[in-house]
UniProtKB/Swiss-Prot annotation:
GO biological process terms on file: RNA processing
Compartments in which it is found: Cytoplasm
Organism: Escherichia coli O157:H7
Protein name: RNA 3'-terminal phosphate cyclase
Lineage: Bacteria, Pseudomonadati, Pseudomonadota, Gammaproteobacteria, Enterobacterales
Gene, per the UniProt record: rtcA
Binding site for ATP: Q103, Y283, L284, A285, D286, Q287
Length: 342
């Protein structure tokens, strides 16, 4: 019988990522875990609908036995079974993030007995979660280099608070893992600005694009009008394609916040990324930790290690025989992964 891993949900940034990473790793390694103080660092601690959906999805995919899987619970015991490929559908029932639920279960399906499709309904444009276009255009090309083949499709947008969005991913078992080296970003090839609108006047998008164009030379400027019933909602994105990596940044519009202020927030974030020679942005760094750890080697550079990143690393090291080493050099932090030997 494998040992039970005990996790403190209040460690580090104290959010839901601790539990999501633990669920992924438990399904992959077969190691059971218990976590207390779930989301202790949040204003409303405990399991919300999004987190509960992730737990139920993980339970279904591997036939786990679970204790504490209920709304508001701050304690969870998870004993995994065998991961099974298949066609899965999960509904969050709110505007909670579809991609964060997918992020929980897809790594386990890299080790399944056959191909899978996972469809999640809920929120797709959430200020605190990666949108589907980030997964599709930024993360998945890097996963392919590691040897992980999955394809995400956004079937319908769902903005806060209504939700109603749908995201689906098709994924195949991994034959073998490759190491990823992301030390340098390289020269910028082009930048693309994009605005999504649903039930919001077009002049809002035009003002947002104008704000981006005032700060950056945009190769493309795209405005996409979505059906009104998918809103109201507004998202502004800016994609930076460099020689070695593509990064994508986004901001979700808010009521009573002007188009110029919304776009200026995005400009500030992109300028912060470009001011450093680091290859990887803050949020992409979080996404790379688990797949690169499964590969057992690799490295990337980030401007500054966030508390979120450090917390995720700590959880991964509890489950996998790897060590992360962080070294500051030439104005960036180099994150290196090595496999531990017996």
């Amino acid at each position: 019988m494998k040992r039970m891993i005990a996790l403190d949900g209040a460690q580090g940034e104290g959010g839901g990522q601790i539990m999501r990473s633990a669920l992924s790793l438990s399904m992959i390694t077969g190691q059971p875990f218990t976590i207390t103080g779930i989301r202790a660092g949040r204003a409303k601690p405990g399991l919300l609908r999004q987190h509960l959906t992730a737990v139920k999805a993980a339970t279904e995919i591997c036939g786990a036995t679970v204790e504490g899987a209920e709304l508001g619970s701050q304690r969870l015991v998870f004993r995994p079974g065998t991961v099974r490929g298949g066609d899965y559908r999960f509904a969050i029932g709110s505007a909670g993030s579809c991609t964060l639920v997918l992020q929980t279960v897809l790594p386990a399906l890299w080790f399944a007995d056959g191909p899978s499709r996972v469809e999640v309904s809920g929120g797709t444009d959430n200020p605190s979660a990666p949108p589907a276009d980030f997964i599709r255009r930024v993360l998945e090309p890097l996963l392919a280099k590691i040897g992980i083949h999955q394809q995400t499709t956004l079937l319908r947008h769902g903005f806060y608070p209504a939700g109603g969005g749908v995201v689906a991913t098709e994924v195949s078992p991994v034959a073998s893992f490759n190491t990823l080296q992301l030390g340098e970003r390289g020269n910028i090839v082009q930048m693309r600005g994009e605005v999504l609108l649903a039930g919001v006047p077009r002049h809002v998008a035009e003002r947002e694009i104008a704000t981006l164009a005032a700060s950056f030379s945009l190769h493309e400027q795209n405005i996409h009008n979505l059906p009104r019933d998918q809103g109201p909602g507004n998202t502004v994105s800016l994609e930076v394609e460099s020689e070695n990596i593509t990064e994508r940044f986004f901001v979700v519009g808010e009521k009573r916040v002007s188009a110029e202020v919304v776009a200026a927030q995005l400009v500030k974030e992109v300028k912060r990324y470009l001011a450093s020679p680091a290859a990887v942005g803050e949020y992409l760094a979080d996404q790379l930790v688990l797949p690169m750890a499964l590969a057992g080697a690799g490295q990337f550079t980030v401007a500054h290690p966030s508390c979120h990143l450090l917390t995720n690393i700590a959880v991964v090291e509890r489950f996998l025989p790897v060590r992360f080493t962080l070294a500051e050099t030439d104005g960036v932090t180099r994150v290196m992964i090595t496999k531990l030997t017996d």
